[in-house]
């Protein structure tokens, strides 16, 4: 394979201008991501009273200390439906990404119960389906921490069919021999369904 040599001149004014412009966009994304975390953290007093950890605290304890974490679909649902991009920003009411657990690279999903009880949303479902696609392509083990109020019934028409596909994907993972671990951190309306899935462990 021939070597592709870069012709980018990192000391040029145009490069510096592009770098500056892109950094502003990256900073904007990081600010939005922090708003989502802050929105979830507003429920800390409620979680503390119940003796529970916030979703991101659970995730931190699950991951190998100091290990790599790649968040995915961080702005899923941004300004869609009742997401106003500010105080009601939700990230699809879930956290998704790739990280290491006991030295094994895994796809991890976490219900963000700090936001609307972790209720499933249309874009949260899309986020889960994208995660499943990555699992199938890379044969990644799947870990999900579940504390969810179930589906947002006001948006049920937007997610019913694709929500069913997420359950089908769990069965497909089982058939492919992909390790799957679903952990309930609180009783959930999804318990009755997921407990009967062949891939649940």
Task: Go through each PLM region and give its residues.
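Conserved small/polar residues in nucleotide/adenosyl-binding loops
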Residues: 184-189
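Terminal-region recognition feature
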Residues: 1-181
């Amino acid at each position: 394979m021939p070597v592709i040599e870069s012709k980018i001149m990192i000391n040029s004014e145009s490069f510096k201008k592009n770098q500056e412009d892109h950094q502003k966009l990256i900073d904007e994304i990081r600010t939005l991501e922090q708003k989502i975390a802050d929105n979830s953290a507003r429920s800390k007093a409620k979680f503390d009273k119940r003796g529970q950890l916030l979703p991101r605290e659970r995730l931190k304890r699950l991951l190998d200390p100091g290990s790599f974490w790649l968040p995915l679909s961080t702005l899923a649902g941004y300004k869609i439906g009742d997401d106003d991009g500010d105080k009601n920003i939700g990230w699809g009411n879930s956290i998704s990404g790739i990280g290491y657990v006991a030295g094994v690279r895994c796809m991890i999903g976490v219900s963000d119960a700090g936001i609307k009880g972790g209720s499933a949303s249309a874009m949260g479902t899309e986020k889960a389906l994208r995660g499943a696609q990555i699992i199938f392509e890379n044969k990644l083990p799947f870990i999900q921490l579940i504390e969810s109020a179930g589906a947002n019934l006001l948006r049920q028409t937007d997610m019913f069919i694709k929500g069913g596909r997420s359950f089908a994907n769990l069965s497909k993972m089982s058939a492919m021999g992909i390790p799957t671990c679903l952990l309930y951190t609180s009783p959930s309306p999804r318990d009755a369904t997921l407990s009967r899935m062949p891939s649940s462990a």
